[in-house]
Curated annotation (Swiss-Prot):
The keyword Membrane does not apply. It comes from Thermococcus onnurineus (strain NA1). A motif ('HIGH' region) lies at residues 43-53. This is Leucine--tRNA ligase. One of its GO terms (cellular component) is cytoplasm. GO terms for molecular function: aminoacyl-tRNA deacylase activity; ATP binding; leucine-tRNA ligase activity. Signal peptide: none annotated. A motif ('KMSKS' region) lies at residues 650-654.
Amino acid sequence: MAELNFKAIEEKWQKRWMEDRVFEPDRNAKPKEKKFYITVAFPYLSGHLHVGHARTYTIPDVIARFKRMQGYNVLFPMAWHITGAPIVGIAERIKNRDPKTIHIYRDVYKVPEEILWKFEDPKEIVKYFMKAARETFIRAGFSVDWSREFHTTSLFPPFSKFIEWQFWTLKDMGLVVKGAHRVRWDPVVGTPLGDHDIMEGEDVQILEYVIIKFILEENGEEIYMPAATLRPETVYGVTNMWLNPEAIYVKAKVRRGDREETWIISKEAAYKLSFQDREIEVIEEFKGERLIGKYVKNPVTGDEVIILPAEFVDPDNATGVVMSVPAHAPFDHVALEDLKKETEILLKYDIDPRVVEEISYISLIKLEGYGEFPAVEEVEKLGVKSQKDEEKLEEATKNIYKAEYHKGVFKIEPYAGKPVQEVKDLIAKELQEKGIAEIMYEFAEKPVISRFGNQAVIKIIHDQWFIDYGNPEWKEKAREALANMTIYPESRRTQFEAVIDWLDKKACARKVGLGTPLPWDPEWVIESLSDSTIYMAYYTISRHINKLREEGRLDPEKLDREFFDYLFREEFSEEREKELAEKTGIPAEIIHEMKEEFEYWYPLDWRCSAKDLIPNHLTFFIFNHVAIFRKGHWPRGIAVNGFGTLEGQKMSKSKGNVLNFIDAIEENGADVVRLYIMGLAEHDSDFDWRRKEVGKLRKQVERFYELVSEFASYEAKEGVELKDIDRWMLHRLNKAIEGATKGLEEFRTRTAVQWAFYSVLNDLRWYLRRTEGRDDEAKRYVLRTLADVWVRLMAPFTPHISEELWEKLGGEGFVSLAKWPEPNPAWWNETIELEEEYVKNLIEDIKEIIRVAKIEDAKRAYIYTAPEWKWRVAEAVAEKRDFKAAMSELMKDPEMRKHGKEISKMIQRLIKDRAFEIKRIDEEKALREAKDFIEKELGLEIIINPEEDKGGKKKAAMPMKPAVFVE
């Protein structure tokens, strides 16, 4: 067969789908129980979509197609996200001719040079990639209702008015507030950064360090050296301080409110603290070595402790000053032990090695299972030899910190006897009240880079607008909604619960970027994770809005709060519709239709997206729905999918390790791409794109097309007499229908593909082998029937070639709208399946015997099936599952007692092997029916149950496991 022209087939059916508006739902449907509304996070248009995105968008399309074929009225809409700073940042970098950005857009995204320079205007970026994304989605065969398409920001006024309404509603509820809060900040551009504004380090946590002001006397001046710690309770156990002798430190005046102090901190810390409500005036810079060997005073205990050298101290982490608590910190203990062995380092700084030798550890925490110094014991237990054993040290630190926090009891007055997790906060609070300590915010990992290409810092912002996700009552409603939602996979539920717990105020607006101006404070622009939480409701009315816009009958400025309140929050009212018609100029009957559509489609059945959106978008989606909509409109389910890699490597635009979705379609055909990414891993697992494997799959898809095309010419005559192998094929087809259906109902796409494609393909290969040489009506009936079912099973995954094959089969209309197959009760036949499995296994066993025994020129095989009494033993064991019970039951029969010793051994063996599943088949009948086939497969004469016991094998026969002798 000639190579299949996937592109021609795809274009043919995409054109027909668009012309016939196949994927626009029935607008007159009434029974709500047969509606299915599914959405996926709309794509952000800063570049081309890659094959990782392909997974995110193909999953809901496959589910939408499946439900449509099940008879549901399905809504699967799409829109485009352009809000925020990233697109503006890209335009800025292209304007500045940034080489990295130019490389990505010219070489990776293949943007023509004449268009690339237009990207200095953010609107040109949006225009180009919106068109490209739409084309990609159409080329992929996504069954989208394009009549509802829109994009975000004030560039699309109707949606912008919807967002204004959302924010007024939240503000009226007290859920949008103004105040001071820590945010990720781009210090160059001067704007807060949401998750989508981060190019690198999006998931990095913000840590809250307590910085404790140790006191240094220098030239008669009292100077503070603030040591940063996540464990303020351990200040009672400090034995020394650590500084990096090679790092640059500063002496600086630090002003906060009406307080002015002199601090010594790293140069990097001085810069970062200047963003956290402190005015920093650097007096001098110097290397850390200047302070090594000096003493500082612990402000809590009054102890004088020495400053020791430590190159492990990172000046870019917190203050660059570290307090050492070796009894409870494995790193500190090991660093001290290393220093004791490296006296030359101490002598370099005129430190007497005996000073370090004589450092006494201070025990603070009683921990069950450990002695006085848990850190020392954990280090010994894990076999840590030095600071070079980084992995083991990290493990030791994690183990001790976790154990002490959850199970430790504090030993030092006035907190003695209290749990560490309680003491930690008490001490932190007390130290701050006394002015001994302050708070500093720091990233848990670095770097954190904004999409403008700048290193982010943490800034305390005043007069910033926030959505208050920390509101306790709101959290409770979100928990209630989550408890009533279906989450796929269920294992992700705990992550949602955790996010609801820790979510706090979230900056919702910034002063740069594209978006909708905050309606009451328009110098602020609503950011991208805040204008994308309830747009699923807007989809329900957007086709009407779009039509009115196209006809020139819409004034977006008239879409006020009352308009959206009525559509989304009030009961039906003819009077209100007339009032709103007067105000908006929209006919009352259209307003009524909008209201009807919202009430019909809501609640949303499924929200789909990748797992990285759980800590932000997907949880914000729950919060905003429970705030704005009544309980009956709260979402029903969220499906979370995994990520994609390319040839085993994480995809990276900057490194060129990325495959654009559209390029994958061009290379392989949309249906091959769809089937590959759906069949490679379950939707919640990560997948790896391998070009070689995609090529293999393409050949299998072509074989599918070839087989069904051939079977399309057959006539499926009802009432033909079927042989057992025909019944087996129909039974297996039933299993494929059942397996694929269950897989798709549970979003287990890999399982569904295994059943719908691979299982049918493999079973068909076996059936064709078993029926080789036959060309009768029964076989033609089976193959024609199989073709009809198989094409429908494959339609959600490979819609284009399925449509082409459906047409060849003479199917009515589009296969996309055909009835999803259901198991035929008349086809079920477990016994025939067992018999066929029995034949398959026997063939493999005989091949193995010939190979292992190295039998050359084998002529015949003698097959001995299990006698009746062995079947009875197997059935008794399956029923009783106990030696005594089975033996007792069997020995009641005099005939069985004749085989007493053999039965005893057989029961023991079956119980040991846990052979508790047994279903009786007529082994001899199965063998005689398949005798010709077995002989042909093996090239041997097959003799079934002869009188002669060849090689004494007869006694080895067991139920479902015949004895074999080959000569």
